[in-house]
Amino acid sequence: MSVLLVGVSHRSAPVSVLEKVAITDADRPKLIDKMLASSHISEAMIVSTCNRVEVYAVVDAFHGGLAEVGELLTRHSGLAMPDLTKHAYVRYSEAAAEHLFAVASGLDSMVVGEQQVLSQIRGAYATADAQQAVGRTLHELAQHALRVGKRVHSETGIDRAGASVVSVALDRAAQVLGDLAGRTAVVVGAGAMGGLSVAHLARAGIGRIIVVNRTIERARRLAETAASYGVESSALELDRLHEAMSAADVVLSCTGAVGAVVTLADTHRALADRDRAEFPAGDRPLVFCDLGLPRDVEPAVAGLPGVAVIDIESLQRDPAAGAAADDTAAARSIVAEELAKYLAGQRMAEVTPTVAALRQRAAEVVEAELLRLDSRLPGLAEPERDEVARTVRRVVDKLLHAPTVRVKQLASTPGGDSYAEALRELFELKPGAAQAVAAPMEITAIGPDRTAGLADDFTPGHRLDFEQHLGEEGKPA
């Protein structure tokens, strides 16, 4: 069994494609159930954020698993297979682990070094685990990835470029508005991103925060959090969004809803109210930070006078969205080190059952020979028989000690699983003595680039996409 990753992210696809592939919290359990019901998938986890959707699946065959995940994503997104393959990337086995470690470290984020992705991976794991979709393989992979992310953030300065997408969005808003201190902000959505927005706004010295949400109770709770930071705050239901916007300087939205939340009609109403107020719209810009995926702000809003829209796609071009080169290099070094540890542990886990099976086989042979001795020498005294038994067992243990210790050492090296395979072949151990591994033919389909450098993860030389493996109908090529 090996881990297959199929993903679409801000690096590989435009926002229009990401919006279609986006998986909501409500959809995620349904898609996991469908994967578990398929023929080749035994474990599954979906990481879905504002700028990425990644499916991690433990599969018994590369091509079969890829076909099933690809079909699932095309049905969910409504995209034709050729359209999906243009923007999807595939990682397998070691490369899948390397990618998740990089994601957890913030190396693959739109804002390099942001930490929110750690909680998103933790949430993805919790959702999959609650559905009993996580076994040993994904458990160890996800937990190790979380440890890698924590280590990178504690030992490097990779997050100095900005704690999250929110911080960069607010920097862009400040370029339009000037200092944010004392201004009024509207936060649309009371989820994790809403909470992050409130924290960043408070640190920026915002004067007032209005939280808008479909559920007023959640809006009030987040408003109370804002108040605990010493910021004047209030809460409104979503149908009163235009009222909040009429008083705002900046609106941050990330609801995860399907369809526009900030509509052209509501924005027109808000701007009309501002025109009747003390400050005309032309003298008081209204800035929208649309952090939602799918987008929360209707595209036509960006064309209104006095309005600026900062969205996920524009943030990709922000020069402030990168960490210092030395911090990034240090983070990559940690990822490489931890990947080597993880892979060594996985190889060891694969060889341990084989060693145990070998010792069990030897013990069975010893017992069989002792029984044969009893039948041949029925008059053998008990003390002599015990001494013979101890001697035979010592001989067997000494013969097995060196090869079993050595095979465990070799198992931690690249290609070490071949030694365990040799033991299984030489001693005719049962196939179930160790986990099955992917056939060599399937592994070589990945090519020599399975451990490609993280910096060029999506360049043509390093990217592996569906088209190498699937036909137009999503069947194995």
Swiss-Prot record:
InterPro entries: 4pyrrol_synth_GluRdtase, 4pyrrol_synth_GluRdtase_dimer, 4pyrrol_synth_GluRdtase_N, GluRdtase_CS, GluRdtase_dimer_dom_sf, GluRdtase_N_sf, NAD(P)-bd_dom_sf, Shikm_DH/Glu-tRNA_Rdtase
Enzyme class: oxidoreductase
Active-site residues (renumbered): 50 (nucleophile)
Subunit text: Homodimer.
Family of this protein: Belongs to the glutamyl-tRNA reductase family.
Pathway: Porphyrin-containing compound metabolism; protoporphyrin-IX biosynthesis; 5-aminolevulinate from L-glutamyl-tRNA(Glu): step 1/2
Domain notes: Possesses an unusual extended V-shaped dimeric structure with each monomer consisting of three distinct domains arranged along a curved 'spinal' alpha-helix. The N-terminal catalytic domain specifically recognizes the glutamate moiety of the substrate. The second domain is the NADPH-binding domain, and the third C-terminal domain is responsible for dimerization.
Further facts: During catalysis, the active site Cys acts as a nucleophile attacking the alpha-carbonyl group of tRNA-bound glutamate with the formation of a thioester intermediate between enzyme and glutamate, and the concomitant release of tRNA(Glu). The thioester intermediate is finally reduced by direct hydride transfer from NADPH, to form the product GSA.
UniProt source species: Nocardia farcinica (strain IFM 10152)
GO molecular function, one term: NADP binding
Annotated EC: 1.2.1.70
Residues reported in the UniProt entry to bind substrate: 49-52, 109, 114-116, 120
Site positions for Important for activity: 99
Record-listed NADP(+) binding positions: 189-194
GO aspect biological process, one term: protoporphyrinogen IX biosynthetic process from glutamate
Protein name in the entry: Glutamyl-tRNA reductase
Gene: hemA
Annotated keywords: NADP, Oxidoreductase, Porphyrin biosynthesis
Function: Catalyzes the NADPH-dependent reduction of glutamyl-tRNA(Glu) to glutamate 1-semialdehyde (GSA).
Catalysed reaction equations from the record: (S)-4-amino-5-oxopentanoate + tRNA(Glu) + NADP(+) = L-glutamyl-tRNA(Glu) + NADPH + H(+)
